[in-house]
């Protein structure tokens, strides 16, 4: 069942994105983005270019991050898995914040709780969820062009994300989407603090930048723009595709197919590629 649904979602995505057809050119005006070459030229002015991951370098072919959990639940044969998984993560975040003042959690910690309170085998759960991420994550075609242009110019590229996946997990995901050759990867759960508090930017400035100029590219106006600027970084806002496309997308569709449809249309029309 999981495989059938996954393949159906991919089939819809390929048709909408035109992967199996000659590529239609989406104009600068229709996508609302400057050309990738224009953005790359702006970023070339800085010594170090930093990228966010989800909704910036990588896009999910689903309209919400938690929609991945629907497919995990289907694969594991567990009803109401989405609610269970989402609630367990937030329970753990609240408990850690009350105990140590940090909301950062790891993938392994989440599934330790899932096993303890929900009876989900931690190893099987982690494998199923990460495989689902691999199945539904793709490179943002627009940002991939920008990334490759900068890399060809020999620029220093770092990747910075607030995420529960460890560096090892994220390296696999980035590689599966074609991102190789970046200089450093910083993940919040490995430090116990993230971009949201500004502390991860501060840490990178102190231990990695050594006074070099830096600009961060990301989709969250508070986390990727305001907090970066507060720490003395320049920032380039990339509005996420779902915010741009949401008002045009139908909502009266089944959860799985509707999520895939909305996501793939948003990628096609609003990524900038």
Regions found by a protein language model. Give the residues of each.
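Short, acidic loop-to-helix structural element flanking the phosphoryl-transfer center
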Residues: 32, 100-159
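Flexible inter-domain linker/hinge segments
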Residues: 241-273
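Membrane-proximal basic amphipathic "stem/tether" segments
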Residues: 1-30
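Active-site neighborhood of HAD-like aspartate-dependent phosphohydrolases
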Residues: 38-86
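Substrate-recognition/cap helix-loop segment adjacent to the acidic, metal-dependent catalytic center
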Residues: 151-158, 163-189
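N-terminal accessory alpha/beta regions
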Residues: 85-109
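Conserved Lys-Pro-Asp/Glu-containing loop-to-beta segment of HAD-superfamily phosphomonoesterases
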Residues: 196-222
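Acidic, Mg2+-coordinating phosphoryl-transfer loop and its flanking beta/alpha structural elements
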Residues: 217, 222-250
């Amino acid at each position: 069942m999981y495989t059938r649904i996954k393949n159906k979602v991919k089939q819809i995505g390929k048709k909408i994105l035109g992967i199996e057809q000659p590529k239609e050119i989406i104009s600068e005006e229709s996508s609302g983005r400057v050309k990738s070459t224009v953005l790359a030229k702006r970023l070339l002015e800085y010594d170090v270019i930093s990228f966010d991951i989800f909704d910036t370098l990588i896009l999910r072919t689903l309209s919400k991050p938690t929609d991945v959990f629907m497919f995990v639940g289907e694969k594991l044969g567990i009803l109401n898995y989405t609610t269970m998984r989402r609630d367990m993560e937030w329970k753990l975040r609240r408990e850690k914040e009350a105990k140590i003042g940090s909301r950062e959690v790891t993938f392994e910690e989440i599934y330790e709780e899932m096993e303890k309170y929900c009876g989900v085998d931690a190893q099987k759960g982690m494998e199923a969820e990460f495989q689902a991420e691999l199945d539904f994550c793709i490179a943002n075609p627009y940002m991939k062009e920008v990334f490759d242009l900068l890399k060809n110019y020999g620029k220093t590229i770092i990747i910075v994300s607030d995420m529960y996946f460890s560096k090892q997990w994220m390296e696999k995901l980035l590689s599966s989407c074609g991102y190789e050759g970046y200089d450093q990867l910083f993940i919040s759960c490995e430090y116990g603090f993230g971009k949201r508090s500004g502390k991860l930017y501060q840490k990178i400035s102190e231990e990695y930048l050594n006074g070099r100029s830096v600009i961060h590219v990301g989709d969250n106006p508070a986390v990727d723009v305001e907090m970066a600027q507060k720490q003395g970084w320049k920032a380039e806002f990339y509005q996420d595709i779902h915010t741009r496309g949401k008002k045009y997308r139908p909502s009266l569709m089944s959860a799985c197919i509707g999520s895939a449809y909305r996501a793939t249309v948003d990628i096609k029309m609003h990524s900038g590629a």
